[in-house]
Amino acid sequence: MSCIAVEAVLLGILLYIPIVLSDDRAPIPSNSAQLNSWFDGIIQPVAVRKATMDPALVTAEGQTKVIKLKSDGSGDFKSINEAIKSIPDDNTKRVILSLAPGNYSEKVKIGMYKHYITFYGEDPNNMPILVFGGTAAEYGTVDSATLIVESNYFSAVNLKIVNSAPRPDGKRVGAQAAALRISGDKASFYNVKIYGFQDTLCDDKGKHFYKDCYIEGTVDFIFGSGKSIFLNTELHAVPGDQPAIITAQARKTDSEDTGYYFVNCRVTGGGAFLGRSWMPAAKVVFAYTEMVDAIHPEGWILVKPEHESTVRFSEYNNKGPGANMEKRAKFVKRLSDAEAKQSISLGSIEASKWLLPPRVVGLP
């Protein structure tokens, strides 16, 4: 057989071999009306995607355990903390805490070895509320959170997380109070509402995904070193005497693969800045986001003058009166179409390997 014939046969074989592409590289649509259909097409159930997902996650999703909890203590355990204690370290299966409506007045910490845990609110129209009033004065800032998650593959669906401590007045030392700290890798949040004032959400480290969420606060109310996408999420700056600051991303150098991406979100509330350069190479992107006129024209704040050449604050095709770029600070980058296409996708958090649709628990 000639070389040409061999090449033809090989080419024919290759044409019939199915090629699995990384579909999480598809750009997030600019039209919010298309988000759900786009998302459902890419992030399909684990049964369809076993070949491309983390093997340990596939195994965990194949052996699910459901724990039912009620706020009056009449569920399978008296409290969320008791239920968490029942889960062994190095857990290898998905454990779902199915939460009935009500107030769960607890400070909850999920240790770094308790993987594959889901908090699931049974009624999206009457969501369970996890509430506590810890402050930095008592616990330290990052440990003041009502919910602390240090393990991997955590997920929350239909949940309110509240830090009920009073608003800092600038006089009380240690008044900042977090509602949620997420320090584990590969975590997802669907229809989760997070309430606080200063330091509401510590998006600490790891890859995270937020969809259809609500986050409110005052100063630095989303902060940390995570690499996270916020999709169709409302960021509410609580009005007050001083302007709010939405983000304080903690990237120190360009070698760190971290950053916050807000895509198809909404910025509401009182006067606010989109972020400040808490660390020299802070990286934050806002794209396709609706911004009210309460956004200060400069948009962003430098903590130190030398940060001007090192921060990575970017905007792309935002809308609304607060999105006007005419008076934006000169260190803010307006992304090109090519740059936006490269960075505004689920591929930035390797979603094809771990991100799953929101869990729907069918209970008898």
UniProtKB/Swiss-Prot annotation:
This protein's GO cellular component annotations are:
extracellular region
Q: Catalyzes what?
A: [(1->4)-alpha-D-galacturonosyl methyl ester](n) + n H2O = [(1->4)-alpha-D-galacturonosyl](n) + n methanol + n H(+)
Species assigned in the record: Olea europaea (Common olive)
This chain belongs to the protein called Pectinesterase 1
Q: Where are the transmembrane segments?
A: none
> How does it get modified post-translation?
Glycosylated.
Residues modified by glycosylation: N103
Q: Which GO terms describe its biological process?
A: cell wall modification; pectin catabolic process
Q: Which SUPFAM superfamilies match?
A: Pectin lyase-like
* Keywords noted in UniProt: Allergen, Aspartyl esterase, Glycoprotein, Hydrolase, Secreted, Signal
Q: What is its EC number?
A: 3.1.1.11
Pfam families from the xrefs? Pectinesterase
State its location(s).
Secreted
Report the pH profile: Optimum pH is 5.5-6.0.
**What pathway does this protein act in?**
Glycan metabolism; pectin degradation; 2-dehydro-3-deoxy-D-gluconate from pectin: step 1/5
Q: What class of enzyme is it?
A: hydrolase
In the record, the note on similarity to other proteins reads: Belongs to the pectinesterase family.
Query: Which PROSITE patterns does this entry report, sorted A to Z?
Result: PECTINESTERASE_2
Q: Which residues form the active site?
A: D220
Tell whether rRNA-binding is among the UniProt keywords: no
Span of the secretion signal? 1-22
The organs and tissues expressing this protein are described as: Expressed in pollen.
The protein's job, in short, is: Catalyzes the demethylesterification of homogalacturonan components of pectin. May be involved in pollen tube development.
GO molecular function term, any single one = pectinesterase activity
